[in-house]
């Protein structure tokens, strides 16, 4: 039993790496076996010297007590390297092939405690427009209106177009106030004329003038939305009294979508905040506007047109005749002879060769007396064709004959 156990221990010796080696005992007769020893699964790079049976048993027992757990190493394969070298296109996958979520690297947090290691080049400054900017050389198109006439107007920071004398304003009408009275009060603060551009907001009561009946009005009560509001008020000075002349027209929409409107003839109460856009201008300044426009053209370098209207009547007449001179088109030199005939179809089939030479010979022009002349000429042409056929040895055959 001891020898058998010693043999088993000698045959299966465990190394310090947890790997087993197998050895076969030599033949008792001292000869060599023909079969080679089996190749171990995991060959140990460290060779174990042969020992005696008691020493081998002692080593095996010590190694078995202090043996470490076996481990395995996973080496990268060629497929993995090929996949890494292969460039993937398109959007990266959100899930792995096994269904697990792909873990992506979180971006570096942006905070003051984390210093930036990468240095970015300074941003290049773009080329400026330079001193040759035409817009800077010219005067500004918009400027604040600081004329003494408009100091009383309730418009803060209003823009005045150069040469237009038009200033926009925004009026806010609170709930329960009359929009018409608000606009009239604003127009009486200055000497300028006003025009209503637009408005929006809810209306609770409105009185409209009916165009069908003279002097008739109609009042609507409810909640309506302003679609449009237009009108103007001009200042009139007559007999030392200053008054305003003008009117407004409105278009409203009801809660059911019905649209109606007309000229305002009474109350125009706001059901909520109403915003009104008005513009003020100086009326009767047509001549000054023309002068300002001329000055602006000269300032901007616009040259006036070179059209001159100081020309004499004779020169104007000569230009007209030169433009409206008639062009004489010469008549064509080719002339066609027309032959009167009463049987155009017969002449077309019997005189095919002559028809090719003169396409107008078979067109009837009119008159009944020319039939005999056409028949005689047709017979002469037939005689000429027969003579040509006999000369060239051909058989003459009429166009209206059916070949057998």
From Swiss-Prot:
Ranges of compositional bias, category Pro residues: 35-51
Places the protein is found: Nucleus
Biased composition (Acidic residues): 373-393
A GO BP entry: xylem development
Pfam families the UniProt entry points to: PCC (PF03479)
Tissues in which the protein is found: Expressed in both procambium and xylem precursors of the root meristem. Also detected in the endodermis in the late elongation zone and onwards.
Leader sequence segment: none
Chain span(s) of sequence motif Bipartite nuclear localization signal: 86-94
Region of interest: Disordered: 1-51, 70-100, 113-133, 359-404
DNA-binding region: 86-98
Molecular function GO labels: minor groove of adenine-thymine-rich DNA binding
Domain of life of the organism encoding this protein: Eukaryota
Annotated knockout phenotype: Misspecification of tissue boundaries between the xylem and procambium.
InterPro entries given in the database record: AHL, PPC_dom
Keywords: DNA-binding, Nucleus, Transcription, Transcription regulation
SUPFAM superfamilies: AF0104/ALDC/Ptd012-like
Ranges of biased composition (kind: Basic residues): 123-133
Subunit field text: Homodimer. Interacts with AHL4.
Function of the molecule: Transcription factor that specifically binds AT-rich DNA sequences related to the nuclear matrix attachment regions (MARs). Acts redundantly with AHL4 to regulate the formation of tissue boundary between the xylem and procambium in the root meristem.
Free-text note on domains in this protein's UniProt record: The PPC domain mediates interactions between AHL proteins.
Protein name: AT-hook motif nuclear-localized protein 3
Annotated source species: Arabidopsis thaliana (Mouse-ear cress)
Gene this chain is encoded by: AHL3
């Amino acid at each position: 039993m001891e020898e058998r156990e010693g043999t088993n221990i000698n045959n299966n010796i465990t190394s310090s790496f947890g790997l087993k080696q197998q050895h076969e005992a030599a033949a008792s007769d001292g000869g060599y076996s023909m079969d080679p020893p089996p190749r171990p699964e995991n060959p140990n790079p460290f060779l174990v010297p042969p020992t005696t049976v008691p020493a081998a048993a002692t080593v095996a027992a010590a190694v078995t007590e202090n043996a470490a757990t076996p481990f395995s190493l996973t080496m990268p394969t060629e497929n993995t390297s090929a996949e890494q070298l292969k460039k993937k296109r398109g959007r990266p996958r959100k899930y792995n092939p096994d269904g697990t979520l792909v873990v992506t690297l979180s971006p570096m947090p942006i905070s003051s405690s984390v210093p930036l290691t990468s240095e970015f080049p300074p941003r290049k400054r773009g080329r400026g427009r330079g001193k040759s900017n035409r817009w800077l050389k010219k005067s500004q198109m918009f400027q604040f209106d600081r004329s003494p006439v408009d100091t009383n107007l309730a418009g803060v920071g209003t823009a005045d177009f150069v040469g237009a004398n038009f200033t926009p304003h925004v009026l806010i009408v609170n709930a329960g106030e009359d929009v018409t009275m608000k606009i009239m009060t604003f127009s009486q603060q200055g000497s300028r004329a006003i025009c209503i551009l637009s408005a929006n907001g809810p209306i609770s009561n409105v009185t409209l003038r009916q165009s069908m009946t003279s002097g008739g009005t109609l009042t609507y009560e409810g909640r309506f939305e302003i679609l449009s509001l237009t009108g103007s008020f001009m200042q009139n000075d007559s007999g030392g009294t200053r008054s305003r002349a003008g009117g407004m027209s409105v278009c409203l929409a009801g809660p059911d979508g019905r649209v109606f409107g007309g000229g305002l003839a009474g109350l125009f109460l706001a059901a909520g905040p109403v915003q009104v856009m008005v513009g003020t201008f100086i009326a009767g300044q047509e001549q000054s506007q023309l002068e300002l426009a001329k000055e602006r053209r000269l300032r901007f370098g616009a040259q006036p047109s070179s059209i001159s209207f100081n020309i004499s009547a004779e020169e104007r007449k000569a230009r007209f005749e030169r433009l409206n001179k008639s062009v004489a088109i010469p008549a064509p030199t080719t002339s066609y002879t027309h032959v009167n005939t009463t049987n155009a179809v017969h002449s077309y089939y019997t005189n095919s060769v002559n028809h090719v030479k003169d396409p107008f010979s078979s067109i009837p022009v009119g008159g009944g007396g020319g039939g005999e002349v056409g028949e005689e000429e047709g017979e002469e042409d037939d005689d000429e064709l027969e003579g040509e056929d006999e000369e060239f040895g051909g058989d003459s055959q009429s166009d209206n004959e059916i070949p057998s």
